[in-house]
Protein backbone atom coordinates (compact mmCIF):
# COMPACT_ATOMS: atom_id res chain seq x y z
CA UNK A 1 0.00 0.00 0.00
CA UNK A 2 1.27 3.46 -0.92
CA UNK A 3 1.91 6.00 1.84
CA UNK A 4 0.76 9.54 1.08
CA UNK A 5 2.12 12.27 3.28
CA UNK A 6 -0.14 15.24 3.99
CA UNK A 7 1.60 18.42 5.06
CA UNK A 8 0.06 18.97 8.48
CA UNK A 9 0.65 22.68 9.00
CA UNK A 10 -2.75 24.12 8.07
CA UNK A 11 -5.83 23.23 6.04
CA UNK A 12 -8.29 20.34 5.74
CA UNK A 13 -5.80 17.73 6.85
CA UNK A 14 -8.30 15.22 8.23
CA UNK A 15 -10.44 15.46 5.09
CA UNK A 16 -7.38 14.72 2.94
CA UNK A 17 -6.55 11.76 5.19
CA UNK A 18 -10.09 10.39 4.71
CA UNK A 19 -9.82 10.78 0.92
CA UNK A 20 -6.45 9.01 0.85
CA UNK A 21 -7.96 6.07 2.74
CA UNK A 22 -10.77 5.88 0.14
CA UNK A 23 -8.21 5.13 -2.58
CA UNK A 24 -6.64 2.38 -0.45
CA UNK A 25 -3.53 4.32 0.49
CA UNK A 26 -2.12 5.08 3.92
CA UNK A 27 -2.19 8.74 5.01
CA UNK A 28 0.72 10.08 7.05
CA UNK A 29 0.48 13.51 8.64
CA UNK A 30 3.70 15.45 8.04
CA UNK A 31 4.54 17.81 10.92
CA UNK A 32 8.35 17.77 10.80
CA UNK A 33 10.90 17.28 8.03
CA UNK A 34 11.76 13.89 9.52
CA UNK A 35 8.17 12.80 8.83
CA UNK A 36 8.91 13.04 5.08
CA UNK A 37 10.95 9.83 5.29
CA UNK A 38 9.26 6.76 3.83
CA UNK A 39 6.39 8.44 2.00
CA UNK A 40 5.52 7.66 -1.62
CA UNK A 41 3.85 11.02 -2.35
CA UNK A 42 3.12 14.35 -0.68
CA UNK A 43 -0.10 16.38 -0.59
CA UNK A 44 0.13 20.09 0.18
CA UNK A 45 -3.38 21.14 1.24
CA UNK A 46 -5.18 24.43 1.02
CA UNK A 47 -5.25 27.05 3.72
CA UNK A 48 -3.64 30.48 3.69
CA UNK A 49 -0.60 30.27 1.42
CA UNK A 50 1.38 33.10 3.04
CA UNK A 51 0.97 31.57 6.50
CA UNK A 52 1.77 28.05 5.29
CA UNK A 53 4.83 29.37 3.43
CA UNK A 54 6.18 31.15 6.51
CA UNK A 55 5.63 28.04 8.63
CA UNK A 56 7.35 25.91 5.97
CA UNK A 57 10.37 28.21 6.24
CA UNK A 58 10.30 28.09 10.07
CA UNK A 59 10.09 24.29 10.16
CA UNK A 60 12.74 23.78 7.46
CA UNK A 61 10.40 22.29 4.84
CA UNK A 62 11.24 24.47 1.82
CA UNK A 63 14.56 22.90 0.76
CA UNK A 64 13.50 19.41 1.84
CA UNK A 65 10.36 19.49 -0.31
CA UNK A 66 12.20 21.09 -3.25
CA UNK A 67 14.57 18.14 -3.26
CA UNK A 68 11.95 15.39 -2.97
CA UNK A 69 11.90 12.96 -5.89
CA UNK A 70 8.35 11.80 -5.21
CA UNK A 71 5.00 12.93 -6.67
CA UNK A 72 3.50 16.07 -5.12
CA UNK A 73 -0.14 17.18 -5.22
CA UNK A 74 -0.95 20.78 -4.32
CA UNK A 75 -4.57 21.82 -3.75
CA UNK A 76 -5.64 25.49 -3.63
CA UNK A 77 -2.96 27.15 -1.46
CA UNK A 78 -0.79 24.12 -2.24
CA UNK A 79 -0.94 25.13 -5.92
CA UNK A 80 0.15 28.64 -4.95
CA UNK A 81 3.07 27.32 -2.89
CA UNK A 82 4.34 25.09 -5.70
CA UNK A 83 4.41 27.97 -8.22
CA UNK A 84 7.16 30.30 -9.45
CA UNK A 85 5.34 33.45 -8.42
CA UNK A 86 2.16 35.23 -7.41
CA UNK A 87 3.00 38.90 -7.80
CA UNK A 88 3.20 39.08 -4.00
CA UNK A 89 6.24 38.65 -1.79
CA UNK A 90 5.79 35.31 -0.02
CA UNK A 91 7.75 32.09 0.52
CA UNK A 92 7.24 29.62 -2.35
CA UNK A 93 8.61 26.21 -3.25
CA UNK A 94 9.30 27.54 -6.77
CA UNK A 95 9.13 24.09 -8.43
CA UNK A 96 6.11 24.38 -10.76
CA UNK A 97 6.69 26.48 -13.88
CA UNK A 98 3.58 28.63 -13.63
CA UNK A 99 2.59 31.94 -12.14
CA UNK A 100 -0.54 32.09 -10.04
CA UNK A 101 -3.34 34.61 -9.62
CA UNK A 102 -4.10 34.36 -5.90
CA UNK A 103 -7.76 34.59 -4.84
CA UNK A 104 -8.64 34.92 -8.54
CA UNK A 105 -12.34 34.37 -7.93
CA UNK A 106 -12.61 36.95 -5.16
CA UNK A 107 -13.12 36.80 -1.43
CA UNK A 108 -14.50 34.07 0.83
CA UNK A 109 -18.08 35.15 0.06
CA UNK A 110 -17.39 34.61 -3.65
CA UNK A 111 -16.59 30.92 -3.10
CA UNK A 112 -18.59 28.50 -5.25
CA UNK A 113 -19.03 24.91 -6.40
CA UNK A 114 -19.10 23.77 -10.00
CA UNK A 115 -18.82 20.66 -12.17
CA UNK A 116 -15.53 20.56 -14.09
CA UNK A 117 -13.59 17.85 -15.92
CA UNK A 118 -10.36 16.29 -14.64
CA UNK A 119 -8.76 13.37 -16.44
CA UNK A 120 -11.82 12.89 -18.63
CA UNK A 121 -14.15 12.56 -15.62
CA UNK A 122 -16.62 15.10 -14.31
CA UNK A 123 -15.91 16.19 -10.75
CA UNK A 124 -17.80 18.46 -8.37
CA UNK A 125 -15.19 21.11 -7.55
CA UNK A 126 -15.28 23.37 -4.49
CA UNK A 127 -13.55 26.71 -5.07
CA UNK A 128 -12.79 28.69 -1.88
CA UNK A 129 -10.86 31.93 -2.49
CA UNK A 130 -9.34 29.84 -5.25
CA UNK A 131 -6.30 30.67 -7.35
CA UNK A 132 -5.97 30.31 -11.11
CA UNK A 133 -2.92 29.70 -13.23
CA UNK A 134 -1.73 32.99 -14.72
CA UNK A 135 1.14 32.16 -17.06
CA UNK A 136 2.59 28.82 -18.08
CA UNK A 137 6.37 29.26 -18.13
CA UNK A 138 7.56 26.07 -19.86
CA UNK A 139 6.37 23.62 -22.49
CA UNK A 140 6.39 20.65 -20.12
CA UNK A 141 3.49 22.08 -18.09
CA UNK A 142 0.22 20.46 -19.20
CA UNK A 143 -3.27 21.77 -18.52
CA UNK A 144 -5.39 19.05 -16.90
CA UNK A 145 -8.46 21.06 -15.89
CA UNK A 146 -10.26 24.29 -16.72
CA UNK A 147 -13.18 26.29 -15.37
CA UNK A 148 -14.50 27.80 -18.58
CA UNK A 149 -11.32 29.44 -19.95
CA UNK A 150 -9.56 29.64 -16.58
CA UNK A 151 -6.80 27.12 -15.89
CA UNK A 152 -7.49 25.37 -12.58
CA UNK A 153 -5.36 22.24 -12.93
CA UNK A 154 -1.87 21.55 -14.30
CA UNK A 155 0.81 18.91 -14.18
CA UNK A 156 4.55 19.02 -14.73
CA UNK A 157 6.81 16.03 -14.22
CA UNK A 158 5.86 14.52 -10.87
CA UNK A 159 3.82 17.55 -9.76
CA UNK A 160 0.04 17.97 -9.96
CA UNK A 161 -1.63 21.20 -8.87
CA UNK A 162 -5.34 22.03 -8.71
CA UNK A 163 -7.01 25.19 -7.48
CA UNK A 164 -10.05 23.52 -5.94
CA UNK A 165 -10.61 21.44 -2.79
CA UNK A 166 -11.23 17.78 -3.77
CA UNK A 167 -11.33 16.80 -0.09
CA UNK A 168 -14.58 18.75 0.35
CA UNK A 169 -16.78 17.05 -2.25
CA UNK A 170 -18.25 13.56 -2.31
CA UNK A 171 -16.75 12.74 -5.69
CA UNK A 172 -13.47 14.55 -5.01
CA UNK A 173 -11.92 11.11 -4.72
CA UNK A 174 -11.66 11.32 -8.53
CA UNK A 175 -8.79 13.80 -8.12
CA UNK A 176 -6.95 11.50 -5.71
CA UNK A 177 -7.47 8.51 -8.02
CA UNK A 178 -6.08 10.57 -10.91
CA UNK A 179 -3.03 11.52 -8.80
CA UNK A 180 -2.51 7.91 -7.70
CA UNK A 181 -2.84 6.42 -11.20
CA UNK A 182 -0.92 9.07 -13.16
CA UNK A 183 1.80 9.99 -10.67
CA UNK A 184 2.21 7.77 -7.62
CA UNK A 185 1.88 4.37 -9.30
CA UNK A 186 4.18 5.50 -12.14
CA UNK A 187 6.94 6.71 -9.83
Swiss-Prot record:
Keywords: Glutamine amidotransferase, Hydrolase, Lyase, Pyridoxal phosphate
Residues at the active site: 76 (nucleophile), 165 (charge relay system), 167 (charge relay system)
Cited SUPFAM superfamilies: Class I glutamine amidotransferase-like
Keyword Transport: no
GO molecular function: glutaminase activity; pyridoxal 5'-phosphate synthase (glutamine hydrolysing) activity
Catalytic activity annotation: aldehydo-D-ribose 5-phosphate + D-glyceraldehyde 3-phosphate + L-glutamine = pyridoxal 5'-phosphate + L-glutamate + phosphate + 3 H2O + H(+); L-glutamine + H2O = L-glutamate + NH4(+)
GO terms classed as biological process: glutamine catabolic process; pyridoxal phosphate biosynthetic process; pyridoxine metabolic process
Enzyme Commission number, as recorded: 4.3.3.6, 3.5.1.2
Pathway given in the UniProt record: Cofactor biosynthesis; pyridoxal 5'-phosphate biosynthesis
Signal peptide: none
Keyword Lyase found: yes
GO cellular component: cytosol; glutaminase complex
Binding site for L-glutamine: 47-49, 102, 128-129
Matches recorded under Pfam families: SNO
Biological role: Catalyzes the hydrolysis of glutamine to glutamate and ammonia as part of the biosynthesis of pyridoxal 5'-phosphate. The resulting ammonia molecule is channeled to the active site of PdxS.
Subunit structure: In the presence of PdxS, forms a dodecamer of heterodimers. Only shows activity in the heterodimer.
Family as reported in the entry's similarity comment: Belongs to the glutaminase PdxT/SNO family.
Protein name: Pyridoxal 5'-phosphate synthase subunit PdxT
Source organism (scientific name): Methanococcus maripaludis (strain C5 / ATCC BAA-1333)
